[in-house]
């Protein structure tokens, strides 16, 4: 069959982001044999995967028992240059480097402060206005009574229209990175060619030493310079090597994030057979499910949905880091935690219920969720996951649906949309935890189902509840950081 052939055929297209819509339309008609690669997004994902901000934070900054950022800690990210690379790194970072802290009304986002330096007025950008800033602009004057509780803005941005040759350039950066003794600071350099970026990186390394500041420096270098040692040790991290993270076919084909995202999509379809249909999947069921979910991944899911699944897996390492853990390949150094040891850290105050179903699917125990989400590290990370998802959706230009749309909107087939309308770029779940409880009550009424059946909060638990299984199946282990 043609779709089976397409499943074995992979064609990678490295296209200009300006024409991404053309490739996206073609991709949906080829069952996944055509893969569009946006090099700027690939560089950004590689950066966030290798260097999540949480990996540079320790007990001075995060309470490992709760994953909450401590009082008196600020997280600052300085972007030097705001062209295609740094703009995409900013959006990918906003969608993944999300932290939580204790606020007046419970857990809330600990906003990262992004300081953007560019010689041009970088805040005036049609792409950002169409995507990331849509939520801020359109919701600012909206009647809040028509919506579920509004989520926070994902981050704070400060724009500095400054040339690197101006005297105030270093002065302004020094003020940012020396403001607090417990602050965590990041500088991402991507304003010019390789040599310009390298030169500024060396100057900032010297300045960091003079300032006595805690600053992690990253520099974009596109090419590999064989035999040349550009930096000593970890004084500066090189990002954006296109031959390794963009144009290497083995990296593209073997993407662990893609594999994990696809595996999660498949396993939850199989679990549905057990939890909703009450039957044990046969080998034929499993193979058919693999084919069906593979086709649906490319044919039915929008790029927004596929990337959402990918970013969920991308956030896994950051969440582990918040607990003082990490993951690495099984053959690498570091003593692996057992599943029991992982659960004792992650879920000791709110155990995972794996006993309600007497069978597993593909080696993964099926987890039972009710509506009793207890205060715990496990729950905090689920809250963080929803706040991260909110931020991802906002970064893509999505806005909340109104309560009226959640209650009454129907699609072309007459089915309730529950406020989810990708064509009009809105979603009923872009809200707070309180809003998600109200959402399930509304949906339970309009569908005549129980609240437990209509709950969506449980989905925010899944990535960490299933982390051990997911990493193990992909050749990785969980270790202490």
Model-derived features: where do they sit?
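Cytosolic regulatory regions of ion transport systems
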Residues: 1-288, 292-392, 397-414, 432-472, ...
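Basic/Trp-rich segment in TM-proximal cytosolic loops or flexible interdomain/linker regions
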Residues: 417-427, 431, 435
């Amino acid at each position: 069959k043609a779709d089976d052939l397409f499943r074995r055929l992979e064609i990678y297209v490295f296209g200009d982001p300006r024409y991404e819509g053309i490739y996206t339309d073609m991709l949906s008609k080829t069952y996944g044999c055509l893969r569009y690669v946006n090099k700027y997004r690939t560089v950004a994902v590689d950066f966030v995967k290798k260097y999540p901000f949480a990996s540079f934070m320790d007990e001075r900054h995060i309470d490992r028992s709760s994953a909450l950022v401590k009082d008196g800690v600020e997280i600052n990210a300085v972007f030097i240059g705001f062209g295609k690379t740094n703009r995409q790194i900013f959006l990918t970072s906003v969608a993944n480097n999300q932290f939580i802290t204790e606020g007046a009304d419970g857990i809330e986002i600990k906003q990262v402060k992004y300081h953007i330096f560019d010689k041009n007025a970088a805040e005036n950008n049609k792409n950002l206005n169409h995507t990331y800033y849509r939520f801020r602009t359109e919701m600012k004057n909206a009647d809040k009574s028509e919506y579920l509780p509004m989520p926070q803005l994902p981050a704070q941005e400060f724009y500095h229209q400054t040339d690197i040759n101006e005297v105030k350039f270093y002065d302004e950066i020094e003020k940012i990175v020396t403001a607090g003794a417990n602050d965590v600071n990041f500088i991402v350099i991507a304003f010019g060619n390789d040599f310009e970026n390298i030169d500024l990186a060396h100057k900032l390394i010297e300045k960091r030493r003079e300032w006595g500041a805690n600053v992690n420096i990253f520099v974009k270098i596109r090419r590999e310079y064989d035999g040349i040692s550009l930096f000593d040790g970890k004084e500066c991290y090189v990002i954006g090597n296109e031959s390794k993270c963009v144009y290497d076919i083995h990296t593209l084909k073997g993407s662990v994030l893609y594999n994990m995202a696809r595996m999660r999509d498949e396993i939850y379809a199989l679990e549905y057979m057990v939890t909703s249909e009450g039957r044990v999947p046969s080998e034929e069921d499993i193979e058919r499910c693999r084919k069906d979910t593979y086709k649906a991944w490319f044919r039915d899911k929008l790029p927004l949905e596929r990337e959402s699944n990918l970013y969920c897996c991308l956030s896994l390492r950051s969440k582990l880091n918040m607990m003082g853990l990490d993951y690495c390949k099984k053959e690498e150094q570091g003593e692996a935690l057992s599943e029991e040891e992982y659960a004792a850290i992650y879920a000791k105050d709110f155990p995972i219920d794996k006993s309600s179903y007497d069978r597993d699917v593909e080696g993964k125990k099926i987890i039972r969720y009710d509506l009793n989400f207890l205060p715990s590290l496990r729950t905090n990370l689920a809250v963080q996951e929803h706040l991260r998802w909110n931020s991802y959706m906002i970064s893509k230009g999505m806005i909340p649906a109104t309560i009226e749309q959640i209650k009454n909107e129907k699609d072309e087939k007459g089915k309730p949309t529950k406020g989810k309308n990708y064509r009009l770029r809105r979603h009923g779940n872009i809200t707070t935890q309180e809003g998600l409880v109200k959402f399930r009550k509304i949906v339970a009424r309009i569908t005549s189902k129980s609240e437990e059946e209509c709950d969506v909060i449980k989905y925010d638990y899944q990535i960490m509840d299933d982390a051990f299984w997911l990493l193990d199946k992909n050749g990785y282990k969980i270790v202490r950081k």
